[in-house]
Amino acid sequence: MVLWESPRQCSSWTLCEGFCWLLLLPVMLLIVARPVKLAAFPTSLSDCQTPTGWNCSGYDDRENDLFLCDTNTCKFDGECLRIGDTVTCVCQFKCNNDYVPVCGSNGESYQNECYLRQAACKQQSEILVVSEGSCATDAGSGSGDGVHEGSGETSQKETSTCDICQFGAECDEDAEDVWCVCNIDCSQTNFNPLCASDGKSYDNACQIKEASCQKQEKIEVMSLGRCQDNTTTTTKSEDGHYARTDYAENANKLEESAREHHIPCPEHYNGFCMHGKCEHSINMQEPSCRCDAGYTGQHCEKKDYSVLYVVPGPVRFQYVLIAAVIGTIQIAVICVVVLCITRKCPRSNRIHRQKQNTGHYSSDNTTRASTRLI
């Protein structure tokens, strides 16, 4: 007599135990690799604003200095904004007109402490409050001319001290003919063209500070971008000396970026772009719209369904590659498990049915033999 046995379960652990480690492998790779979230370049200030301040490091591929925005280029409470294709540092302090004069560490007097901080932001150099009230006249008025009134003896005495070194200059008492030395390194400062009060264009605020230190005169940032009627600036050469650089040599390199320069539209254009930013081009009188991702049209009113993917930068391409490999492995494992189940289950059921039929056949033969004997 053959007892009936329940069919074996095809989805048992023994069937797929050889593939479990393949399922765990992608999970382990995800835990170890932890790819960062892909994101496009920030389109507004809120995209990079964190509780601790401005931080665009997650968007920075270090390929083009035009799109860098970090604490080294916009310090002293400056606000880093993107205007068109350029990132600029804006110092918009809402200072009141209260007259509470303070003396700054650069030897200049300011109407109040707010104006001192605003000057530090524009010059991108640290200016501390030395004392309350205006700076003493004998210590220099802060005009930067380096000339001290008085007799020739008094003037000679003053020039033999380090009091004349201003605007970030350091005094070198061991030098024979040069008292003030400017140890300012602008090699790591990002490109952010500015127009200074001396009518010259500079690549960044650090170069303005450097020129102010070298000339020992007050040079401030007047406007963003290059000066309209100027072609020269001062730069430091490898031997530490200063030389004038003709901007005409680099005009071709900067022409493309200047050509695409845009400025935000006035407030009365609010609502001109439905899903984007309103901008004015320097070559166009009518405003234009810079649409957000997924939108198109003159006023960004149409949805663009062709935007189905984001092209990552080369720095993040390795994370995309890891994710693609993990996805491929998971699909392959699922296919193998499905094939395993579909091939082994019918075979197991077929063997069970054969055994069951064999048992019934033997039982019928025994019954027939007994009947014949009777």
From Swiss-Prot:
PTM remark: O-glycosylated; contains chondroitin sulfate glycosaminoglycans. A soluble form (TMEFF2-ECD) is produced by proteolytic shedding. This shedding can be induced by phorbol ester or pro-inflammatory cytokines such as TNFalpha, and is mediated by ADAM17.
Residues the record marks as carrying a glycan: 204, 230
Membrane as UniProt keyword: yes
Signal sequence bounds: 1-40
Intrachain disulfide bonds: 91-121, 95-114, 103-135, 182-213, 186-206, 195-227, 265-278, 273-289, 291-300
Site, as annotated: Reactive bond: 97-98, 188-189
UniProt-annotated stretches for the region Required for shedding: 303-320
A biological process term (GO) from this entry: wound healing, spreading of cells
Protein name: Tomoregulin-2
Lineage of the species this protein comes from: Eukaryota, Metazoa, Chordata, Craniata, Vertebrata
